[in-house]
From Swiss-Prot:
GO terms for cellular component: actin filament; ciliary basal body; cilium; cytoplasm; growth cone; periciliary membrane compartment; photoreceptor connecting cilium; photoreceptor inner segment. This is Whirlin. It comes from Homo sapiens (Human). InterPro entries: PDZ, PDZ_sf, USH2_Complex_Protein, Whirlin_HN-like_dom1, Whirlin_HN-like_dom2. Disulfide bonds: none annotated.
Length: 907
């Protein structure tokens, strides 16, 4: 029963693998015979339902499960493999043969849908979704046009590029489609014996427009796809860094709903029985540190977990360990607490009474998933009735002036009198995708635009900043319905250009990439564009759609679910060569946020951070004078989303590792498309402030460069940060990868962060008193007082023209700093590079334990001019990071020479 599985044939491997599972979970005697019968039943079903290749994949999936015992990965893989209702009959059979200890998790994941959507070109909805029509529910609808250009009176939505079928999203009152019984929420399965199961939106339009007589096979699904909702899925590891199933009962955040009632959160966190909770009484003496590293917070939909315990600390002495969840501190619940608030409470008292639970696992990384949100057709009809109020009076076209509006979450183009429905649908979508602050901000700018105080360009740019995720961006399709007719063309041009730029940024360069983004006008389809807010320009005189399409390949990369009015209309091509980029206006307001995922040290030697650490600022369009948005509704400042960046930023966090230390989590740092989940500060005893002069005093006569002056860095919205993590070739930790630094967000918008390929490492190992400037007024920095033996050789820079020198800048001077390779890592983080507003790399973090920290000469704010004599002028961000990394790795010399200058000198 426990024989090796890899060498089994396909026909026998399923039985062998399942038999191994049965042996792992069963007892003896009759138990084994019962499980063997279950195995035989499953094996017969596998042979009947799956092809040979699919059985081989199924076997490989089971082998991976046996090796790692990760139920979450098992269900996620089966979600892709078992892609039809018939194949999913294997799930209850499989449950009977897996170990009993894993059956509860298996039931939870298959019942609650906690798995990624399939990555196949066509994916069925969730298990038993509306695409799986039951017997007897399919009906035929026959439609025949009396005239060549007569419309059928309904609109469709969906397509295989969106992972859903083709659905009827609108039926015109009094139209032929309504008379024949077509209803909103019907899924069109076939058109004249042609299946629409796996066709794109454009192909469905061609099929519906290709004949005067249509015989439609439809299934009453009762709902239509309504755009995307952002969900977050976490991967978990045990204290040794091995992948493990998530804790059962952990609530999964859905969309922006991160906060729950605390009583509900407590009742649903049945990770262990109540008796497994324990109280820990900690009294911190003078000079003693708490010695904890924590992770999580309510802004991430998580509790507070202990990810590190310092040897010899009070935490270790009291029995706290990695993998514990902190439930309560001094009577304050930690089940629904923000990360920073938890840090403040832990460091503000010298007597702590903690309630902890031995969960035995840690959240490791987060994946952001955009899932299809479904809208019930009954709700759509109610919305139309409430917004219009007189549906029965609109059976003729001449009663009211026709208007064109966009359907929910798609690029729907429909001739209708129900133009006032647009705002209602926009509000409906915004409630699902935006929090209250963002919702109020969007409403404010729309009101300002309608009042004439804000131009369409300013409105669009403000919305680009506000709708900063893949899911939120789909709201632009509804916003278009509120745009004045004279501004529609400009609105479409701006949105289309942004979409093309974002898609080019998301798709890696390769042969034929240019064809993907070519502007193609589908004059024969009548389909609207597949982009988010890009809609067609409609002439109501002849029902003519002037189509501007970006190709089917474009539709596969976006949120919007295009709708199109299935009318026989003519199309004229419009070239896009006249599109001109709108220059980004200068920021009118800037905000400072705490960068997520930056470890902050909570030591006893806290100083105000130097202002050389920039806050990532975002462009915010302010209203004219005497007009102000409602309180608390300013758009969330932040760096541009991943779509705006030409390339992903680099951030390789540095752990203060010794050559002999073990880092079991390194094997998990290659996860793709995952976000860090938050700052991981080290919590120490309450701070005892020392004077800055004493902190800056360096023993041994080792001079430190003067502190940077307090001039904030006016960085752009696309500021890149880089931390170079380089290990010596002869040292054990060989982590030379780079990882993306999470962009600046507030807690209220974290749930909508889109995935930009970021990977979470293990707490990044920043010690608790280390210099880490996160944001003005929020960061902490302490200056090392240890004496360092390093060389500081001043060297004159070439003369610079002093004319027009901004006030307050020092004369350009440079210093040669020699950094000995005294540790396994260099331990610096840099930002900037060519083609950015910081043309030369600047040090933003120096971590304890690294060679740079041991040197004592480099400091935060230094601008790096040269590395080992190689100039960094003209070097882009990634190239500069690569040069520094290679200089540290080379065995030719045991030091690195950095030519640095102060931040506030002219470069």
């Amino acid at each position: 029963m426990n024989a090796p599985l890899d060498g089994l044939s396909v026909s026998s491997s399923s039985t062998g693998s399942l038999g191994s599972a049965a042996g792992a979970g069963g007892g003896g005697g009759a138990g084994l015979r019962l499980l063997s019968a279950n195995v035989r039943q499953l094996h017969q079903a596998l042979t009947a339902l799956l092809s040979e290749a699919e059985r081989e994949q199924f076997t490989h999936c089971l082998n991976a499960y046996h090796a790692r015992r990760n139920v979450f990965d098992l269900v996620r893989t089966l979600r892709v493999l078992l892609d039809s209702p018939v194949k999913r009959r294997l799930l209850p059979m499989l449950r009977l043969v897996i170990p009993r200890s894993d059956q509860l998790l298996f039931d939870q994941y298959t019942a609650e849908g906690l798995y990624l959507p399939a990555t196949t070109p066509y994916r069925q909805p969730a298990w038993g979704g509306p695409d799986s029509a039951g017997p007897g529910e399919v009906r035929l609808v026959s439609l025949r046009r009396a005239k060549a250009h007569e419309g059928l009176g309904f609109s469709i939505r969906g397509g295989s590029e969106h992972g859903v079928g083709i659905y009827v999203s609108l039926v015109e009152p009094g139209s032929l489609a309504e008379k024949e019984g077509l209803r909103v929420g019907d899924q069109i399965l076939r058109v004249n014996d042609k299946s629409l199961a796996r066709v794109t939106h454009a192909e469905a339009v061609k099929a519906l427009k290709g004949s005067k007589k249509l015989v439609l096979s439809v299934y009453s699904a009762g709902r239509i796809p309504g755009g995307y909702v952002t969900n977050h899925i976490y991967t978990w590891v045990d204290p040794q860094g091995r992948s493990i199933s998530p804790p059962s009962g952990l609530p999964q955040p859905h969309g922006g709903a991160l906060r729950q009632q605390e009583g509900d959160r407590r009742s649903t966190l049945h990770l262990l029985q109540g008796g497994d909770e324990k109280k820990v009484n900690l009294v911190l003496g003078d000079g003693r540190s708490l010695g904890l590293t924590i992770r999580g917070g309510a802004e991430y939909g998580l509790g507070i977990y202990i990810t590190g315990v310092d040897p010899g600390s009070e935490a270790e002495g009291s029995g706290l360990k990695v993998g514990d969840q902190i439930l309560e501190v001094n009577g304050r619940s930690f089940l629904n607490i923000l990360h920073d608030e938890a840090v403040r409470l832990l460091k503000s008292s010298r007597h702590l009474i903690l309630t902890v639970k031995d969960v035995g696992r840690l959240p490791h990384a987060r994946t952001t998933v955009d899932e299809t949100k479904w809208i019930a057709s009954s709700r759509i009809r109610e919305t139309m009735a409430n917004s219009a109020g007189f549906l029965g009076d609109l059976t003729t076209e001449g009663i009211n002036k026709p208007g064109f509006y966009k359907g929910p979450a798609g690029s729907q183009v429909t001739l209708s009198s129900l133009g006032n429905q647009t705002r209602v649908l926009l509000e409906e979508q915004a409630r699902h995708l935006l929090n209250e602050q963002e919702h109020a901000t969007m409403a404010y700018y729309l009101d300002e635009y309608r009042g004439g105080s804000v131009s369409v360009e300013a409105l669009v740019m403000a919305l680009f900043k506000l709708l900063n995720t893949h899911a939120k961006f789909s709201l632009l399709s509804e916003v278009r319905g509120t745009i004045s007719p004279q501004d529609l063309e400009r609105f479409d041009h701006l949105v289309l250009r942004r979409e093309i730029e974002s898609m080019k940024a998301r798709q890696p360069p390769g042969p034929g990439a240019g064809d993907t983004y070519s502007m193609v006008s589908y004059s024969d389809t009548g389909s609207s564009t597949g982009s988010h807010g890009t809609s067609t320009t409609v002439s109501s005189a002849r029902n003519t759609l002037d189509l501007e399409e970006t190709g089917e390949a474009v539709q596969g990369n976006i949120n919007a679910l295009p709708d199109v009015s299935v009318d026989d209309v003519r199309s004229t091509s419009q070239g896009l060569s006249s599109f001109k980029p709108l220059p980004r206006p200068p920021p009118l307001a800037q905000g400072n946020d705490l960068p997520l995922g930056q470890p902050r040290k909570l030591g006893r030697e806290d100083l105000q951070p130097p202002s050389s650490m920039p806050s990532c600022s975002g462009t915010v369009f302010s209203a004219p004078q005497n007009r102000s948005p409602p309180a608390g509704t300013a758009p969330t400042p932040g760096t541009s989303s991943a779509q705006d960046l030409p390339s992903s930023p680099i951030y390789a966090s540095v752990s203060p590792a010794n050559p002999s230390s073990k880092r079991p989590l390194d094997a998990h740092l290659a996860l793709v498309n995952q976000h860090p989940i938050g700052p991981f500060p080290r919590v120490q005893s309450p701070p005892h402030l020392k004077s800055p002069s004493a902190e800056a005093t360096v023993a041994g006569g080792c001079l430190l460069p003067p502190s940077p002056s307090g001039h904030p860095d006016q960085t752009g919205t696309n500021q890149h940060f880089v931390m170079v993590e380089v290990h010596r070739p002869d040292s054990e930790p060989d982590v030379n990868e780079v990882r993306a630094l999470p962009q600046t967000r507030t807690a209220s918008t974290l749930s909508q962060l889109s995935d930009s390929g970021q990977t979470l490492s293990e707490d990044s190992g920043v010690d608790a008193g280390e210099a880490e400037a996160s944001a003005p007024g929020r960061g902490r920095q302490s200056v090392s007082t240890k004496s360092r033996s390093s060389k500081e050789l001043p060297r004159n820079e070439r003369p610079t023209d002093g004319a027009n020198k901004p006030p307050g800048l020092l004369e350009p001077t440079s210093t040669l700093v020699r950094v000995k390779k005294s540790a396994a890592t260099l331990g610096i983080a840099i930002e900037g590079g060519a083609n950015t507003r910081q043309p030369l790399p600047r040090i933003v973090t120096i971590q304890r334990g690294g060679s740079a920290h041991n040197c004592g000469q480099l400091k935060v704010g230094h601008v790096i001019l040269e590395v080992n004599g190689l100039t960094l002028r003209g070097k882009e961000h990634r190239e500069a990071a690569r040069i520094i990394a290679e200089a540290f790795k080379t065995k030719d010399r045991d030091y690195i020479d950095f030519l640095v200058t102060e931040f506030n000198v002219m470069l």
